[in-house]
Amino acid sequence: MTSESRETRTSVALLKRLRPDYIEVEYLPGCVFNTAAMNEVQQARRELMGITPYSMLSIVPEDVDYELSAMNVDHLAVDRKEGALLAIAVVTHANMMELVMKLYFSYYPQLSRIKVTASEDEGRKWLTAQMEELSRTG
């Protein structure tokens, strides 16, 4: 796999593979998180990242909504089982969505390296530190 930047768009997000071990998922303003949309993002992530384990920064804008049924699905179960996700930072720009994401990740424990924050700078710094530690410890 080469290290050039690649990107793709789904109905709800722009996904950018910036390195073979790092992807950013920027959800589109006004989108709705539902099971079909999350499956679409998951498929796009797999196509961009292949089988290489990676870290992910997800950015959720202020005006995103969600369907309750999407909360009843562990959307990252397969990736976690396969060891694909090393660390996740989720940046939410709305208090309600931050609470929803924290609730979701407590209901479906993902992995030990996960952070939900309202600060993009904090999310990026945290994820960078996690990636540096992973590169040292494996």
Task: Annotate the PLM regions.
Residues 1-138:
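Amphipathic, Lys/Arg-enriched alpha-helical "gate/interface" segment within cytosolic domains
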